[in-house]
Amino acid sequence: MSSHILFEHPLNEKMRTWLRIEFLIQQMSFHLPIAEHATALHFFRNVGDLLDVIERGDVRTELLKELERQQRKLQGWAEVPGVDQNRIDSIRLQLKQSSTILMAAPRVGQFLREDRLIGLVRQRLSIPGGCCSFDLPTLHIWLHMSQEQRDAQVKNWMGSLEPMNQALTLILDLVRNSAPFRKQTSLNGFYHDNGDDADLLRLQLSLGDQLYPQISGHKSRFAIRFMPLDSENGSVPERLDFELACC
């Protein structure tokens, strides 16, 4: 078990959406294969949440813009003396390939949105207890089909997200690795700094401190207030060391 815990906080709406998409796709993959009612509901609930997030904006356009922006950044890095040119070229190729695949793919989420079973389950999830067998006989039948049939259908659903997921994974890896962790110290539970056009804050705390950060701000400036997990009996030290990366 790790002695430290990592917190990530988006500094703009674009990054907030991307982190939610990443989280939901991870949740969808967590309990596969689907072999029982509970894991099915976990999967379909996350599919519904993912479609809700995707429908709020033009995810593909934002990802394509970011893929292009990352290519320009790498072009600048390529001119730095002593840089690993092979590594730069490899990442640039991945960015170009991901952009080509994403541009050629259907609208993000369209395949899931048009699926009849997903649509039926999505409607019933908003009703407390609305996914009983008498409410959703189609799901009841689906869960009694062979595991191979269910696996094949889930594979198609997950595969439809792959162009977006590949682009998103590549972008988030580059963002997360764009800045190192540096030791910082908060005074009386408070810390603030300039964002320097960052998209994402990454913060590491000792698990033994039993503290969590409340973060507010945007790409230009941010503030962090540390709060005790036990709000009644916990306390925050006058000086607290932590690790911070502005990515």
Curated annotation (Swiss-Prot):
Entries under Gene3D superfamilies matching the protein: YacF-like (1.10.3900.10), YacF-like domains (2.60.440.10)
UniProt GO BP: division septum assembly; FtsZ-dependent cytokinesis
Chief localization: cytoplasm
UniProt keyword Cell cycle, yes or no: yes
Cellular localisation: Cytoplasm
A GO-annotated cellular component: cell division site
Record keywords, A-Z: Cell cycle, Cell division, Cytoplasm, Septation
Function comment: Cell division factor that enhances FtsZ-ring assembly. Directly interacts with FtsZ and promotes bundling of FtsZ protofilaments, with a reduction in FtsZ GTPase activity.
Assigned protein family: Belongs to the ZapD family.
HAMAP family on file: ZapD
Subunit field text: Interacts with FtsZ.
The protein's name in its UniProt record: Cell division protein ZapD
Organism listed in the record: Enterobacter sp. (strain 638)
Gene this protein is translated from: zapD
